[in-house]
Amino acid sequence: MRSGRYIGVMSGTSLDGVDVVLAAIDEHTVAQQARYCHPIPQDIKMAILGMCQGQAVTLSALGQLDTRLGILFAEAVLTLLKETGLRAQGITAIGCHGQTVWHEPTGEAPCTLQIGDNNRVAALTGITTIGDFRRRDLAYGGQGAPLVPSFHHALLLHPVERRIVLNIGGIANLSLLVPGAPVRGYDTGPGNMLLDAWIWRHCAQPYDKDALWAINGQANPLLLRRMLTDPYFALRAPKSTGREYFNLGWLERMLAGLPPIAPQDVQATLVELTAISIADQVLLVGGCERLLVCGGGAHNPLIMARLSALLPGIEVSTTDECGVNGDDMEALAFAWLASRTLSGLPGNLPSVTGASQETVLGAIYPVNVD
């Protein structure tokens, strides 16, 4: 593997900021050295949300958003470099996931679209950039997601302990790590996405800090049962999903025809949906000795408490306790995937995505050579 300093850039489905990490990576280690979270302007956030929820968009608007996000990602990287005192010449490459605006891995013409012009990122930072990671897996018949389980396997596989790594971002996904067995992983369903969208609508807050709003509500059993009957939860892996499926429109359809439910009770019910849909899948894959949680949902005490209650006998903790910052897991993963791409090594796991073979992921955007 080509060792060096890499930067990972991740803007996830939760839209809570652009996460940027600096890591020293070689064949055996991934050592995080710095982190920075760059704010996403509200107008860009609203444009992304509109596209993800199927609103009509012109090619001009899509192209301009692609450009603006590329500039935003470059600004985030340059800020990290300024804060660390590093120069572009000291960085081997950037792994830039891009912003997913559509993910449709099934049907006649499976597709996934991440925007944020990597040409701009490379040009503005002066650093070789690797992006467009998902579509190569899709080309080999895979879901294109999740891709992070390969990184979980590299960092968190235990020689004897059966583990599940659970990322609760906008969407929740798990990685089953069993010594001596192929990695399994897939999206379980909503993570923070519906919770964040609902509290934004009713309280104009980006997220429910410490679950204080949900704690004051009471889960509604009728709504919960209706949500859990959604066909996605019964699909067999490999499977993946996103904001284009689980969004406020989906929630409104679930609420339609039910007696009025107080907004904070809906929030409490959404916590139950996230926790139960995750716990059901943990048990479906045979459980584990330790559930390692990362992502924004790891900071939600109500989700964590419900997972512990729903999974007796399983130790529920965070990846931080294993030395991996859970807030930066995905950005670190794409820095690591960039190192594999530059080294000509595969980054996907067919046992996770359903692809017909392992493959090198992504496209390389080199800087000019003097």
Curated annotation (Swiss-Prot):
Keyword annotations of the record: ATP-binding, Carbohydrate metabolism, Kinase, Nucleotide-binding, Transferase
Cite the Pfam families for this sequence.
AnmK
Keyword Signal, does the record have it? Answer: no
Q: Carries keyword Ligase?
A: no
Which Gene Ontology terms cover its molecular function? ATP binding; kinase activity; phosphotransferase activity, alcohol group as acceptor
Major enzyme class: transferase
Recorded E.C. number(s)? 2.7.1.170
Mention one GO biological process in which this protein takes part, according to its record.
Answer: 1,6-anhydro-N-acetyl-beta-muramic acid catabolic process
What InterPro entries does the annotation carry? Anhydro_N_Ac-Mur_kinase (IPR005338), ATPase_NBD (IPR043129)
List residues binding ATP: 12-19
Known catalytic reactions:
1,6-anhydro-N-acetyl-beta-muramate + ATP + H2O = N-acetyl-D-muramate 6-phosphate + ADP + H(+)
In which pathway does this enzyme or protein participate?
Amino-sugar metabolism; 1,6-anhydro-N-acetylmuramate degradation; Cell wall biogenesis; peptidoglycan recycling
Q: Which PANTHER family match?
A: ANHYDRO-N-ACETYLMURAMIC ACID KINASE
- Main function: Catalyzes the specific phosphorylation of 1,6-anhydro-N-acetylmuramic acid (anhMurNAc) with the simultaneous cleavage of the 1,6-anhydro ring, generating MurNAc-6-P. Is required for the utilization of anhMurNAc either imported from the medium or derived from its own cell wall murein, and thus plays a role in cell wall recycling.
- Similarity comment text for this entry: Belongs to the anhydro-N-acetylmuramic acid kinase family.
Q: Which HAMAP family match?
A: AnhMurNAc_kinase
Q: What is this protein called?
A: Anhydro-N-acetylmuramic acid kinase
Organism listed in the record: Pectobacterium atrosepticum (strain SCRI 1043 / ATCC BAA-672)
